[in-house]
């Protein structure tokens, strides 16, 4: 399928909208009440620090809603205002934040049901309005909705669209797209649908397995077993690892994406030589600015003397998880929570999700005596949620 031609055709359809409806002022107050915070603005103005008795709060200097998320949420609110009585669907969570998605449900936005990991579009009919979330949607989903006669409101983050353009360039020039991402993440599913031949690698370990195979050190059967669900149909590692282009899920750890790119560049240079490198390796920068800014701010935050650190964001949020990884790598006592409700003020305990583990509850969350708490949040977390966490910390510190 010529995905580039399909996108171009869809963008010219009268039933497609990716620019909003000119109702920003009408929904501004709703958005401000639901997501913004005066306290957070005050803390920003005070050098990202707050002192309250024995409590010192240090905020990361970049956190919370990114521009792409703000745009997607605002467009969803505008869509409901523009279509007050039409049946309104969304193909997935608008962003990985439970409170934001709950607000959409309260606005009678229907979420496409999922049965055993497969989306069920049978309830969507001609004339329905369907929102594509910030992560985007697969080209097959777009095609289905277009053929069904739906009105499509596309809130896909422009940074995600940039990655789609990159893998389409790989496809055009017969390069295999090596995508650094999580194979089941909505964004990676969408990106791979625009690619031709592709392979998804999760981390440096998987990238090294691919590098070893390229250099003749791997076993074909073991390789195919490892990547059976992370590659394009008919993928042949002996044929499809000769010409590579690197792309990424925009929320992955920046330093890891860069290192994976360097690994493949060095490998192709070693195998084919400098004269032919450009025939075997393509590099594009698809790292999201907002992701990079939040990770850089987190690295600065963990350099400060902190007693503990709270990371706020959806448990299925990739960018939030990577912020938590940075804290863990520094040995800081840290807690990943998805909502302020995870903090129990009556018992001074916190329910949180350690990396790659199930939820657990820790007692004596806020220690006695002077305490410095670092706080950051993922790109899908509104300031209002961060404010609620800080207010709980303030009350706990008074006891």
Curated annotation (Swiss-Prot):
Q: Which domain of life is it from?
A: Bacteria
Q: What are the alphabetically sorted keywords of the record?
A: 4Fe-4S, Iron, Iron-sulfur, Isoprene biosynthesis, Metal-binding, Oxidoreductase
Is Mitochondrion set as a keyword in this record? no
- Alphabetical list of InterPro entries matching this protein: LytB/IspH
CDD domains (UniProt xref): lytB_ispH
- What is this protein's name? 4-hydroxy-3-methylbut-2-enyl diphosphate reductase
The record's Gene3D superfamilies line, in alphabetical order, gives:
3.40.50.11270, 4-hydroxy-3-methylbut-2-enyl diphosphate reductase, catalytic domain (3.40.1010.20)
């Amino acid at each position: 399928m010529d995905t580039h031609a399909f996108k171009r055709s869809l963008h010219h359809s009268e039933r497609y909208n990716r620019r909003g409806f000119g109702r920003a002022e009408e929904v501004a107050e709703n958005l401000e009440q639901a997501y913004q915070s005066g306290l957070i603005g005050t803390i920003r103005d005070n050098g990202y620090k707050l002192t309250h008795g024995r409590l010192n709060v240090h905020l990361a200097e970049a956190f919370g809603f990114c521009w792409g998320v703000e745009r997607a949420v605002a467009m969803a609110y505008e869509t409901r205002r523009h279509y007050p009585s039409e049946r309104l669907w969304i193909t997935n969570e608008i962003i990985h934040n439970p409170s934001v998605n709950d607000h959409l449900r309260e606005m009678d936005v229907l979420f496409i049901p999922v049965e055993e990991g497969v989306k069920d579009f049978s309830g969507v009919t001609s004339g329905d309005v369907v929102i594509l979330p910030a992560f985007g949607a697969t080209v097959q989903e777009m095609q289905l909705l277009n053929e069904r006669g739906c009105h499509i409101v596309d809130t896909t983050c422009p940074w995600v669209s940039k990655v789609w353009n990159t893998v389409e360039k790989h496809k055009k020039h017969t390069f295999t797209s090596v995508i650094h991402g999580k194979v089941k993440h909505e964004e990676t599913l969408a990106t791979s649908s625009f690619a031709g031949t592709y392979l998804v690698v999760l981390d440096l370990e998987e990238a090294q397995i691919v590098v070893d195979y390229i250099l003749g050190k791997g076993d074909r059967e073991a390789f195919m077993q490892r990547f059976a669900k992370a590659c394009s149909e008919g993928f042949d590692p002996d044929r499809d690892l000769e010409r590579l282009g690197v792309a990424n899920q925009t929320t992955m750890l920046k330093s890891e994406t860069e290192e994976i790119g360097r690994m493949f560049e060095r490998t192709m240079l070693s195998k084919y030589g400098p004269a032919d490198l450009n025939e075997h390796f393509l590099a594009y920068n698809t790292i999201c600015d907002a992701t990079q800014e939040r990770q850089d701010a987190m690295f600065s935050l963990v350099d400060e003397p902190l007693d503990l650190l709270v990371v706020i964001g959806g448990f299925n949020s990739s960018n939030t998880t990577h912020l938590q990884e940075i804290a863990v790598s520094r040995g800081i006592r840290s807690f990943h929570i998805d909502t302020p409700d995870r903090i129990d003020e009556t018992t001074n305990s916190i329910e949180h999700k350690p990396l790659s583990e199930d939820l657990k509850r820790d007692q004596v969350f806020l220690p006695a005596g002077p305490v410095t708490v670092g706080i950051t949040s993922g790109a899908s977390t509104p300031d209002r949620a961060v404010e609620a966490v800080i207010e709980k910390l303030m009350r706990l510190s008074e006891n």
